[in-house]
Amino acid sequence: MKDSHQTIGVFVRPTHYQNPLFEKLERAKEWVLKLLEDEGFESFMIDGLDGAKDERLIEKAYAFLCLGGDGTILGALRMTHSYNKPCFGVRIGNLGFLSAVELNGLKGFLQDLKQDKIKLEEHLALEGRIGKTSFYAINEIVIAKKKALGVLDIQAYVGHTPFNTYKGDGLIIATPLGSTAYNLSAHGPIVHALSQSYILTPLCDFSLTQRPLVLGAEFCLNFCAHEDALVVIDGQATYDLKANQPLYIQKSPTTTKLLQKNSRDYFKVLKEKLLWGESPSKKR
């Protein structure tokens, strides 16, 4: 095992004691920390994804273990994005598209990690800017209306060239990694997670001619809404977008880094998670 692999940070999302997963997470935290020690790793715990962090600890870590579901992984990836550190998910919860292993497979994963038998996947991330405020998104950036009623007009530009006006509930700008998240629920296309592209998917557009659009990641995009709107990052953070204020989006110079088992197959994951090829009775 390389010395640089010896320290693992552990992310756990705070869970209310009335949440059905609370006791399971509490037991899992203790078990994971003990397992890391038994396998020869140093570790430290980060409870919460609210931005409070010890930069020295994050710099010290080789990677971050995210205990929970995809939401925990997304929060951890955004927090550590500028540090260029990989994360891996240990699933406790539901779907888990991003997770590397189940809890009962963690020991084998750590043993493979010590022997450098784990693959590093690098995915496109988004960098957004509103005024002087910059942020990263792992799955998607959503421009959403603030009011329950009415239509939100969004003017879209490639560089400085206008190319479309969306009129509806909003617009999703997704990464390939995020194409199986909110984008998929909004009837956007699934794009291979390692592709270099953006997916623009309108939300309940007024025009029946509007369809999702896939653009190469070499483009810089910007958007303006005709009235105040919300910008939602990975379903976890929000920013205000004033009327006619530009939102700039481009490919982040730093990739999203996920550690996965060598045996992981993207198409097999899609088949299992989306129940492709299953009979209707099994899907229920």
Swiss-Prot record:
GO terms for molecular function: ATP binding; metal ion binding; NAD binding; NAD+ kinase activity. The active site is at 70 (proton acceptor). Keywords: ATP-binding, Cytoplasm, Kinase, NAD, NADP, Nucleotide-binding, Transferase. GO terms for cellular component: cytoplasm. Coiled coil: none annotated. It is an enzyme of class 2 (transferase). InterPro entries: ATP-NAD_kinase_N, ATP-NAD_kinase_PpnK-typ_C, NAD/diacylglycerol_kinase_sf, NADK. Gene3D superfamilies: Probable inorganic polyphosphate/atp-NAD kinase, domain 1, Probable inorganic polyphosphate/atp-NAD kinase, domain 2. Belongs to the NAD kinase family. Involved in the regulation of the intracellular balance of NAD and NADP, and is a key enzyme in the biosynthesis of NADP. Catalyzes specifically the phosphorylation on 2'-hydroxyl of the adenosine moiety of NAD to yield NADP. This is NAD kinase. It comes from Helicobacter pylori (strain Shi470).
